[in-house]
A protein has these predicted regions:
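Bacterial N-terminal signal peptides
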Residues: 7-17
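Terminal, regulation- and interaction-focused segments at domain boundaries
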Residues: 21-53, 145
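Compact, glycine-rich, soluble single-domain proteins
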Residues: 46, 50-99
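C-terminal partner/receptor-binding element of secreted or periplasmic proteins
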Residues: 118-151
Length: 151
């Protein structure tokens, strides 16, 4: 009986830890084609009050490495004044800003993937930054959900 309970406990802990790790990434799948999803992503970013910084093609390097993909982009965005302020106050945040969402075609659908900004909270005890990370997470979820709903 004791062994059985221990096994259940180990299984429960493993299940919970996998769920916690999954929250490090935000991901949605859109039924829309890549072009429509890319357009919806740019509109959703703007609607949330962010400025599109740049769109970087990732597929070129992948193709040169032998992978077959023709629609793979990293979309960078942020609020310019916020980026300047945070970069000056917290230079160690520079690698994480501007925010980014990766968008790529998979068959007839499009996937969007991003690192959850809340994972940064573990490294910063500052309550002000915690609020910023929470807002970024909510905004990214909203942006990605708008793209998911786009047809």
């Amino acid at each position: 009986m004791r062994r059985w309970l221990r096994s259940i406990l180990v299984l429960l802990v493993c299940t919970l830890s996998v769920g916690a790790q999954a929250e490090d990434m935000l991901m949605v799948r859109s039924r829309a084609q890549f072009e429509e999803s890319m357009s919806a992503l740019q509109e959703a970013i703007s609607a949330q009050g962010y400025t599109l910084s740049r769109v970087q093609r990732v597929d070129i390097g992948l193709s040169e490495s032998g992978f077959k993909t023709d629609k793979y982009r990293a979309v960078f965005f942020g609020k310019p004044e916020e980026i300047r302020t945070l970069s000056a106050r917290y230079p160690e945040l520079i690698p994480y800003i501007p925010l980014q969402i990766v968008i790529f075609a998979e068959g007839d659908e499009t996937l969007l993937v991003a690192a959850n900004p809340m994972h940064l909270r573990a490294d910063y005890a500052d309550a002000e930054l915690g609020a910023v990370f929470a807002r970024w997470e909510q905004d990214m979820r909203t942006i990605m959900e708008q793209v998911r709903k786009a047809e």
